[in-house]
């Protein structure tokens, strides 16, 4: 589908009909009249503005905990209406995929509905069907839902020419990017999400105001707290844009924040603002995020420690490799299993797995604790945590451990003092062949390139 109907409901939350809402609540199964009465009284409670009481005959209160749920109940009929227009009244086959194929052969155009709160998009295959749906839904909202579609903001869009605006993204239909392997090239269109730069620019302006507030404070502790708040906003924006093609958006955030920080630091430290630029890896705030990055950022020094502004580009793009499974839910066993399969690449470790440590290992650890040996009690306890962290697989080749693939626990840096050598970050689980290769055993030429890089990385850490 390359044609889209972008819908905009005029004042959706302010124009919800209370009578219809209560009827819909009854229809979905809320039959306790006391609960319905409480909801009705909440909806009609009104509000006071400048000492004047205003009655609320329509709409749901904005910002309330219950309002998003009530609006979803109200618009649930719209979702089912679009579904019934395509598939539900025509069910003949046992499996839905066969029905879809049958409807396609009979000339019925498929439709896909996406809705988040009051923002919705319907995808279809032809321009004629898109305009027909727009006209039909205008009448449906007016007569059945007692709401009005904004004709100025409800568009019919060709995704091949213009993208649809949805939840801060612009989604376009374009050809897949070509890879080095010609066998994977295809002329099929795919949906590509891009950040909505117009909306992002407004967010960046708000972020720049927060950066300027750093210059209003005189105490370094207050400045550091404001820097932490700015960092949380930057990371929040970056993580929201993660599923899209967002490198240009990240650079826009970093460029404008850095320019604003330059002006603030010039005002705070007129003679030494250049010395206040330090590499990210030297910052004491967010050390795991900044590890290994040499890009310089503006920072302040407190008790010999640097606290600086982070960069958005550190948050890498992450595309969803699997389509969303609508049967995921925390309320059923099947829904929870689907969630685990959707969110994790591999099956989680079983909760009842046997301990790695044998009774002989524990006895050896107790004997070794007072003698300064590496294999002390802390080692045998922490390697259990390291095994869980590594998800029961080799850190180099990625194979899962079993009776056929035995394992060793490797010390990343064996020259650390005894109080640091057995900490969890210094332990890594490797299969025996990879462990031997780390300790200078020959690397076979057929080994995966990614595994070779990891083995060489562990070798370098042994030499330091």
Regions found by a protein language model. Name each.
Residues 1-151, 156-159, 163:
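Conserved polymerase palm-domain catalytic core
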Residues 263-368, 372-373:
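Acidic catalytic cores of enzymes that act on phosphate-bearing nucleotides/polynucleotides
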Residues 350-396, 419-421, 425, 458:
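Short, charged surface segments at domain edges that flank catalytic/cofactor-binding sites
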Residues 6-7, 56-65, 117-123, 213-219, ...:
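Glycine- and acidic
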Residues 215, 222-290:
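Non-catalytic, peripheral interaction segments enriched in hydrophobic/basic residues
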Residues 93-108, 149, 375-383, 391, ...:
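Flexible, glycine/threonine-enriched loop-and-boundary segments that flank and lead into catalytic domains
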Residues 398-432, 442-446:
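Histidine-centered nuclease catalytic patch
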Residues 40, 44, 50-53, 145-229, ...:
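A conserved non-catalytic segment of reverse transcriptases
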